Amino acid sequence: MASGILVNVKEEVTCPICLELLTQPLSLDCGHSFCQACLTANHKTSMPDEGERSCPVCRISYQHKNIQPNRHVANIVEKLREVKLSPEEGQKVDHCARHGEKLLLFCQEDRKVICWLCERSQEHRGHHTFLTEEVAQEYQVKLQAALQMLRQKQQEAEELEADIREEKASWKTQIQYDKTNILADFEQLRHILDWVESNELQNLEKEEKDVLKRLMRSEIEMVQQTQSVRELISDLEHRLQGSVMELLQGVDGVIKRMKNVTLKKPETFPKNRRRVFRAADLKVMLEVLRELRDVRRYWVDVTVAPNNISYAVISEDMRQVSSPEPQIIFEAQGTISQTFVNFNYCTGILGSQSITSGKHYWEVDVSKKSAWILGVCAGFQPDAMYNIEQNENYQPKYGYWVIGLEEGVKCNAFQDGSIHTPSAPFIVPLSVNICPDRVGVFLDYEACTVSFFNITNHGFLIYKFSHCSFSQPVFPYLNPRKCTVPMTLCSPSS
């Protein structure tokens, strides 16, 4: 009931032009009221006689000067705007909030659902309108496509979110890895500094003891020499102060003694020839450590691959290689044509990794071994290996880039033999201050180099093969030789 009254009141205070509640209502002589903006717009479009215009509703003429603001209607409109619809009215979402009419039309320009009164209002005048049923399917397709696109965008957004989280985790891992490396590097630097300091101080103490001992011995000799000259002077003074007989008695011996007096100069130790530790020596060590750290970035986990040629003893984890008890290895039926073969070749073993490109690094523990050979091999060559004439024929031209130790102290590299002795390798003696207990091997396939590092001596370079001819896949190579102590492939985490 109340809703019906409100609707009737709204109709009375609705502008006949825009069909909306009156805004700043103006009343004409005929009693009709219009919005100020609507009436002004109507004046511009109409062609009245001079000074007179007609009402848009009843066409009765009126004078412009007679137009009056209708404050009473304005107050009613203000009150109506404050009135809320009942719950039943509010639930009618398919009805126009302004006019209460059912929403049956769709304005294409404004893309809004409107009622028939809205369609006739100034706001939608001249717009293209359609029944909601006519455009619903079209917009359903559009919204479905938009939904599909948004779902795809959502998936992409989730993937981007996952990527950034993964990158964040990766960065945290990388930073933690770098922190660990820095701590390890500086710990190693401190260890090197402590070792260098201790070693230099020990050398100085040894030098001091040796030099002072020799100087003391020289001092004793100089004291004895001075005493001998002093005694000869005393004898001469006594003769010169005595009688003629005392002067001439034994004078020949005295003269001979005088002639034989030759002063022996003391042994000296020039200070400018001493080798004193300099900061430059430490710089060399730091440079070596930096190079070792760089190549260790390419550390690969190497294990050995058993084969039917090698007689080496291999551990279950495929990391340790040792030699059987030294003995003559007799022919294994169907494999070797000689009645016995070179023992060193029979204990050689290849790593399981076939290398055809890139940079690779690994370390081998050879502590307590008196003999070993290690490096890189291009694969076994039985025809060359089992020729008894070829004794330890480890030459690059046969696919071996190796170094070795024998008799516990002699470290050698094996190069190609000369034109005069092509069947025997050219052995290059290597100078190492500290015999390596652990050797690092770095292979750069593209640069054609194989480098060996003395890990025991802070990573100093032992030897480097350059201009290597890698015409086929190469493998890590280990040979324990006749020493039964095992050699061990170290894991990257060791």
Curated annotation (Swiss-Prot):
Protein's UniProt name: Tripartite motif-containing protein 5
**Pathway(s):** Protein modification; protein ubiquitination
Chief place where the protein resides:
cytoplasm
Identify the taxonomic lineage of the organism of origin: Eukaryota, Metazoa, Chordata, Craniata, Vertebrata
Q: Does the keyword Zinc-finger apply?
A: yes
* Residues of the B30.2/SPRY domain: 282-494
The gene designation is TRIM5
Q: How is it modified after translation?
A: Degraded in a proteasome-independent fashion in the absence of viral infection but in a proteasome-dependent fashion following exposure to restriction sensitive virus. Autoubiquitinated in a RING finger- and UBE2D2-dependent manner. Monoubiquitinated by TRIM21. Deubiquitinated by Yersinia YopJ. Ubiquitination may not lead to proteasomal degradation.
Species of origin reads Symphalangus syndactylus
Subunit and partners: Can form homodimers and homotrimers. In addition to lower-order dimerization, also exhibits a higher-order multimerization and both low- and high-order multimerizations are essential for its restriction activity. Interacts with BTBD1 and BTBD2. Interacts with PSMC4, PSMC5, PSMD7 and HSPA8/HSC70. Interacts (via B30.2/SPRY domain) with HSPA1A/B. Interacts with PSMC2, MAP3K7/TAK1, TAB2 and TAB3. Interacts with SQSTM1. Interacts with TRIM6 and TRIM34. Interacts with ULK1 (phosphorylated form), GABARAP, GABARAPL1, GABARAPL2, MAP1LC3A, MAP1LC3C and BECN1.
The record comments on the domains as follows: The B box-type zinc finger domain and the coiled-coil domain contribute to the higher and low order multimerization respectively which is essential for restriction activity. The coiled coil domain is important for higher order multimerization by promoting the initial dimerization.
Matching Gene3D superfamilies, A to Z?
Answer: 2.60.120.920, Classic Zinc Finger, Zinc/RING finger domain, C3HC4 (zinc finger)
Extract the coiled-coil ranges from the record: 132-241
Which of the seven top EC classes does this enzyme belong to? transferase
One of the GO BP terms on file: positive regulation of NF-kappaB transcription factor activity
